[in-house]
A protein has these predicted regions:
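P-loop NTPase motor module signature
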Residues: 1-289
Length: 289
């Protein structure tokens, strides 16, 4: 019996994360009853069936994971292997990326390329609802899957997450609210806290909560993205997690300054809206370049 119990214990990692705690409790009860001399044959049979069912569900999700492709023109693509290695080898990674680097849309795909997202969701937070919806739409398009399928989002008054969902976009407020009913956040295998430099009250609460949760969830990966504003502070908060810096993609910008009125113009002839229209018309006539 002890050999069977140990074998079942080892199989827990073959199950989805959200099933492991309940199955572990049932296994612990069976072990306690066996030590007390009570019959456990029926309990072990039921546990074996439950483990088989959960393991099959995980196997099917893993086989159905989308295969991502990457745009080599994005700056983050040059760092893809380093980012993947850091995620694989560390529980917490801080990614410092400028606007236009591609970090928001490519990070979930890098996680998918590592096989993450089968045992639990890849949760991806955004500070605002419109950003959560638009990022979900973009990632779904890049993966070639309909929105609400393998890529979904959940914001206030709108829930497009289904049983097939692998990547879940949401506001940081939604994730914070979920800690009330899912204190160990067991539906997630990866959490990406995007735009953490904004330091809203929700983000600060989440970072504090996750700091305490991670030791109890060694199977949870945490990725924090920040602009180039003191990323070392986030690293220190999470026990000196590795920091990876990614440059942004920039374009030349020409700045032109002009007075509202030229010296020879009458003040009554042109107000601010008209001056703006004249400036736009001038740029339009000149064309791109």
């Amino acid at each position: 019996v002890e050999t069977t119990l140990n074998s079942l214990q080892n199989r827990l990692l073959e199950c989805p994360i959200r099933d492991r705690a309940a199955l572990a409790r049932r296994l612990q009860n069976a072990r306690r009853r066996w030590r007390e001399g009570q019959p456990v044959d029926r309990s072990l049979e039921q546990l074996t069936v439950a483990l088989d069912t959960a393991a099959l569900r995980l196997s099917e999700r893993r086989a159905a994971l989308p295969v991502p492709t990457f745009d080599d023109d994005l700056p983050i693509s040059a760092h893809r292997e380093a980012i993947a290695a850091a995620i694989r080898d560390h529980q917490v990674v801080v990614l410092c990326g400028e606007t236009g680097s591609g970090k928001t849309t490519q990070l979930p795909k890098i996680c998918l390329s590592l096989g993450l997202g089968a045992a639990g969701l890849i949760g991806h937070t955004q500070p605002r609802r419109i950003a959560a919806r638009s990022v979900a739409t973009r990632i779904a398009a890049e993966l070639g899957t309909p929105l609400g399928g393998q890529v979904g989002y959940k914001v206030r008054f709108s829930d497009r997450v289904g049983p097939e969902t692998v990547v879940k976009l949401m506001t940081d407020g939604i994730l914070l609210a979920e800690t009330q009913s899912d204190r160990r956040l067991e539906q997630y295998e990866v959490l990406i806290i995007d735009e953490a430099h904004e330091r809203s009250l929700n983000i600060d609460f989440l970072l504090g909560y996750l700091k305490r949760l991670l030791p109890r969830r060694p199977d949870l990966k945490l990725i924090i993205t920040s602009a180039t504003i003191d990323p070392e502070r986030f690293s220190r908060h999470f026990d000196h997690a590795p920091v990876i810096e990614v440059s942004g993609r920039t374009y030349p910008v020409e700045l032109r300054y002009r007075p509202l009125l030229a010296a020879e113009e009458d003040e009554r002839d042109r107000d601010l809206p008209q001056a703006i229209l004249d400036a736009v018309d001038e740029v339009w006539r000149q064309g791109p370049g």
